[in-house]
From Swiss-Prot:
This is dCTP deaminase. Homotrimer. It catalyses: dCTP + H2O + H(+) = dUTP + NH4(+). The gene is dcd. GO terms for molecular function: dCTP deaminase activity; nucleotide binding. The active site is at residue 128. Gene3D superfamilies: 2.70.40.10. Keywords: Hydrolase, Nucleotide metabolism, Nucleotide-binding. Catalyzes the deamination of dCTP to dUTP.
Amino acid sequence: MILSDWDIRVYLEKKLLVINPLFPDTIRENGVDLRFGYQFCRFKKDQNIIVDTARDPVDKTLVCEETDENNGIIINPLEHVLATTLEWVEMPNDLIGFVNLRSTFARYSLYIPPTIIDAGFKGNITIELIGGSIPVKVYPKQRFLHVIFARTSSPVYRPYSGKYQKQRGVTPPKPD
């Protein structure tokens, strides 16, 4: 079952769901909008770098930068950029979140891969943005994600406790 704005408010008031900071326009009709944080990371453009997904951390291949509301960051066509949410999110054990790009940003030719926030997850959300056909400039604090919450049929037996638990800022991929 998808949660309405009323249900989301109840979860927040009971502190079962945490979104911090919570802005007046965060809660929408059937989900919440999350904002860009201040940190962005992009992969170096070097044909000689090959990342071994079984062994290599990608820290050496990422260039991370902080920006502000005045300067923003440009996402170039076909560029993959990791972004973080401004908000810290704590999910209860009976909700999952379906993460979607707000249609405004899709209309600017950006897109994201399908993303789920697992029951029990705590942290900032790291999201991959993919540039479309034109360069697009984005800014911290812009609402860019829409998260739809769905209640599981029962609380999950094993809440999320993986390698991205309690991540802060942009968290690059970690080998398994």
